[in-house]
Structure formats: C-alpha cells, structure tokens
C-alpha cells in the first residue's frame, strides 16, 4: 500500500497538515473548485520561480495564500510589482474576495522533493543524460542532510522507441512507516521525444509524537 499511494495523502492528519485549511457549511464544491483554479494559475504563472508548496486559508470573505519558494525575488518582483499583479489576478479568480499573499523563502531547495523533481526535469529538457541528472540530484540532496532519497523517471528515456522507467535511490525511504516524514514531488520534462515524468521521494527522518499527544492517547 505504502509503495503505491501518494505519501503525503497517506500521512495527512497523522504527521502532515492539509494544504487547504478552511471549513464550509455550504458552497463546498464551489470553494474547492476555486482552490483548484487558484493553484493551477499560480503553477502556470510562477513556473520558473521554484514554488514548492501553496497553502490556502479562508476566513469569511478573505483568502490567505502562502507561497513557499526558493526564488522569492522572482515572485515579489521589482518594487513588489509582480506580487501585486498576482494578487489582483487571484482576486478576480476568487470572485472579489480580499486576497493576502505571503511569500515564504525555502532555505534549502535540495531538501524539497518538488524542487528536486523540477531540477531533474529542467536538466532532461536541456538534453542532459537522465542517469547523470538523477545521480547529481541524489548527491546534492544527501549532502543537504536528509536520511534517504528515491528518484524515478518514466518515458522515452534517451530517445528510445519503447518507454520505460528507471529508479535510483540512496539511504532509507520507508514508505510504509506512517511516522516517517516522507516528502513527495513530481514534475514533467517536455523533450523532443515527448514527455518524461519525474518522481522524487525524500526521507527527512521520523516524527515522534509530542508529550501532549502521547498523554492524550493514554
């Protein structure tokens, strides 16, 4: 089971929190679709800004969005012009709700699965050998202090006629252990031979229950 399911979804409510945090008695479907549209817009507009995570919180007629990025300067823009345009566009998508955008800098992009996957995808688009791209990313991530990493690329690797998958890993990545902090990220590389999918799993160690949580269970 742990090998197949999305590691983040499996651990939500156990050691991971939701990325959309709000409650609705009615209009739930509309608000959920609004979240999807906003996330899709941010992903397209900030494709090159190394955005690893988008968190959305709602309160009354207000939308609070936290953007986790390795390139905050690109998101904010000169004199805050880019983030103001972003806020205006999201306000239109959110049907006039008040929008607040908070930018959170990612200090160590080599320890974030989404950014590692995007880096491998960029190298594949630049015609770098997939083996070299994966091995270099694994080495950089292991130097950043993580416990383990697993990478997988799928598609017409090296321009082969038949699509296949290749995996490389180092360290430990216990996907069945629910207390293991597994970060999972995906990306796509658009090459001349078609799309190549990239998946990355990072193991940051085990999250042990706090004393308060342990006492509640007892």
From Swiss-Prot:
Database matches in Gene3D superfamilies: 3.30.300.20, Ribosomal protein S3, C-terminal domain (3.30.1140.32)
Keyword Manganese: no
GO terms of molecular function: mRNA binding; rRNA binding; structural constituent of ribosome
Alphabetical UniProt keywords: Ribonucleoprotein, Ribosomal protein, RNA-binding, rRNA-binding
Lineage top rank: taxon: Bacteria
Signal peptide: none
SMART domains: KH (SM00322)
Domain KH type-2: 38-107
BP-aspect Gene Ontology terms: translation
Classification via HAMAP family: Ribosomal_uS3_B
Complexes and interactors: Part of the 30S ribosomal subunit. Forms a tight complex with proteins S10 and S14.
Function: Binds the lower part of the 30S subunit head. Binds mRNA in the 70S ribosome, positioning it for translation.
NCBIfam families named among the record's database cross-references: rpsC_bact
Protein name (Swiss-Prot/TrEMBL): Small ribosomal subunit protein uS3
């Amino acid at each position: 089971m742990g090998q197949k399911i999305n590691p983040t979804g499996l651990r939500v409510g156990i050691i991971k929190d939701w990325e959309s945090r709000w409650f609705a008695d009615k209009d739930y479907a509309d608000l959920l679709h609004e979240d999807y549209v906003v996330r899709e817009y941010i992903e397209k507009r900030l494709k090159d800004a190394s955005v690893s995570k988008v968190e959305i919180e709602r309160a009354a007629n207000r939308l609070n969005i936290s953007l986790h990025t390795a390139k905050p300067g690109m998101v904010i823009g000169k004199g805050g012009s880019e983030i103001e345009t972003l806020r205006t566009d999201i306000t239109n998508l959110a049907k006039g709700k008040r929008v607040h955008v908070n930018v959170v800098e990612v200090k160590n992009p080599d320890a974030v699965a989404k950014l590692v996957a995007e880096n491998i995808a960029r190298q594949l688009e630049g015609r770098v050998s997939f083996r070299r791209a994966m091995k270099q990313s694994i080495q950089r991530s292991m130097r950043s202090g993580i416990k383990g990493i697993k990478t997988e690329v799928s598609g017409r690797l090296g321009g082969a006629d038949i699509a296949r998958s290749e995996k490389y890993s180092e360290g430990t990545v216990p996907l069945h252990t629910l207390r293991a902090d597994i970060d999972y990220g995906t990306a796509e590389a658009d090459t001349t031979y078609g799309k190549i999918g990239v998946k990355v799993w990072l193991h940051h160690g085990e999250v042990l229950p706090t004393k308060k949580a342990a006492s509640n269970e007892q």
